[in-house]
Amino acid sequence: MSVFFSRTVDKSRVWLWYSAFLCLVTAGPAFGDAPRNLILMIPDGMGPAAVTLARSYWGELVMDQILVGSASVASTNYQIPDSAATATAIATGVNTFNRAIAVDDERRPLLTLIESAEKNGMLTGLVVTSPIQHATPAAFTAHVDHRDKYRQIAAQQLEQGVDLMLGGGAKYLAAGPVTDEDIAANDLVTAMALPDQPDILWYPDLYQKAKEAGYQLITTRAELAQARLPVLGIFARDWLTAPLDRLHGDEDDEPDLAEMTRFALDRLAGNDQSFVLLIEGSTIDSAGHYYDPGWLVHDVREFDQALSVALDFARQREDTLLVAMTDHETGGLSLGRMLRDEQVGEKDYSRDWNLDILRRQKATVMGMLKQIRQGGNPVDVFVENTGITTIYPDQKKSLMGIPGMDLDDEDIEEDAMRVIGAVLSSHVKVDWTTRFHTAVDVGVYAYGPGAERFAGYHPNWQIGRIIAELMDLPVAGTSVGREQFAIDQSGKPSKPLE
């Protein structure tokens, strides 16, 4: 008699058997015992609402196929983290303080996944749309107590010997004078006095050091196809162009994230060595900081396209672990403005967000501000790039105030972008609760050998430890000098290094 109809069988046991049966028939592909390669992807600033908005715009996302869990993001000194602390947690398996680049609360350097991979004879690479010296890539390839020490990070990255580095950040590699910002960040380790002008501090040419170290230097998309390892590809002075601005602009020399991902996988997998590859969709975070939903959906899609390339690669093999997880959410995005069914004053408060506006948007708020700085009338620039013609008096006043702002001040320039973003978002009917990060849990995605280990909830530093265990890379609880120390339940070292 079938157990499903037997009166003598406990119902709870039947349910367990049935659940086990479902697990068997729905199980994914079989993999080897341990992964040989690691592809780690970070969509910087992409929270749950960003995924929802992007999915409503583009349809089902590739990342939806491999969503397995969630992670909390608190650092050791704040519930709301920054990218340096979260990247360090993932890279080292140790929780740390905001602004820290691969150091613990005592400022001791921590061994990272990429460093451990290099010590074990693996190839390593990083692909980002930020400067390569920015917080996330830096936390895998350098050790400083403050993320703003970009020149020091740049020098350490070259000493590290990462086989492939693609992104922006030319201004931190070129020779140049020490600035007030550099002094404020105490980023003076690599500076030197000029022989004929001892009162002037100057940074050396790190491009020359890269050449001496054997790197092939490339700066354009055309050069990328012919490049070989080791390669340093720097395609922008600062950040790479946002996908939305690239779509409607003329920045043809910059590769997109999927192109760089495809190139990196081809080169790193083109021999018998295993590899660790870090990929970051860096400017999703920028879209959240500046309240730009159109920028956001295009950046999430660019990341998803790169993830598709990585997932296709992993699906063709049984030896590659793909893990993607957000470092933190940015902006506190809220979708829709549900108050009541009727209009409130002159403004239409609808329950639904307006995707038609995003489909008409031709420039990010950064792109629009650039046009305003070139002399464009703020309202005309806004209308031209969004298709929005009904602009309320308070919104028009805000936009027209932009030319009077001190746009040479970086903080004020960012405020100007938020002015444009706030007007845009009000018409799209989405909202933002902060110009900074939030503490909400973020998504974790995984495919390949050991992917089931990421199911459910974990603190972000535990994700780093699981990756290290699966890859057999000694990271968590290890300093750069290989000293071991214990990790407590909060992810912090529980005793000093000996």
Question: Positions of the model-derived regions?
Answer:
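A post-motif C-terminal structural segment
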Residues: 35-37, 46-51, 56-88, 93, ...
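Boundary at the C-terminal end of the N-terminal hydrophobic targeting segment
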Residues: 30-32
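Bacterial N-terminal signal peptides that target proteins for export
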Residues: 5-18
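Glycine-rich anion/phosphate-binding loops
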Residues: 102-111, 144, 148
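A short glycine/threonine-centered beta-strand motif
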Residues: 42-43
